[in-house]
Design a protein with these regions (language model features):
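Conserved catalytic core of sirtuin-type NAD+-dependent deacylases
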Residues: 1-188
């Protein structure tokens, strides 16, 4: 993703400090999407995505943990998946964790920041994508830990295995004696 620009490292701090201003800036930027946003929107699942979905369909792959936010695994047919860094096609309440498809979530520029639609929840809504500096939602961490504990084989594919907490899961599995398969163009 660095080919098309990197998101700011202080994005969550900016959001948390002034969510209204963050949303105003986001609405202004949506008129001219970044190269990064355009590249993600144009991306299509590749044979790797389809291959993993097929492994799940035939019962070889039980669950997929991904750091990708592009929804390509789901679009390829993956069913059992945890998107540890969220999904850019969804919105999420920062307080209760409720989620909505981005296409169905209406943001009123006159009433920012947008608030949760769940009854009795005053939470602020943002993109489901986890920003730099933002805590990963607890339910995603719980599910990743749960699936790691259940794994009888663990594959890491196309990752440097350096971004935590995702990098801890193959290590935890290996410490339990679970076979680890690494598919990566570079040694990690």
């Amino acid at each position: 993703w660095t080919i098309h620009g990197e998101p700011p490292l202080n994005e969550f701090q900016t959001f948390a400090t002034d969510p209204q201003r963050w949303w105003e800036r986001r609405i202004d930027e949506s008129a001219t999407p970044s190269d990064f946003a355009l590249a993600i929107d144009a991306a299509e699942p590749n044979p790797g995505h389809y291959g993993l979905a097929e492994l799940e369909a035939i019962g070889v792959l039980r669950h997929l943990i991904t750091q990708n936010v592009d929804d390509l695994h789901r679009r390829a047919g993956q069913q059992s998946i945890t998107e540890i860094h969220g999904n850019r096609h969804w919105m999420r309440c920062m307080l209760c964790g409720a989620r909505w498809p981005k296409a169905e979530f209406i943001v009123d520029p006159e009433d920012l920041p947008p608030r949760c639609a769940a009854p009795m929840c005053p939470g602020i809504v943002k993109s489901d994508t986890v920003m730099f500096g933002e805590p990963i939602p607890g339910e995603a961490l719980f599910r990743c830990g749960q699936e790691t504990d259940l794994a009888d084989c663990f594959m890491t594919i196309g990752t440097s295995v350096v971004v935590y907490p995702a990098a801890q899961y193959p290590i935890e599995a290996a410490h339990r004696g679970v076979p680890l398969i690494e598919v990566n163009p570079e040694e990690t």
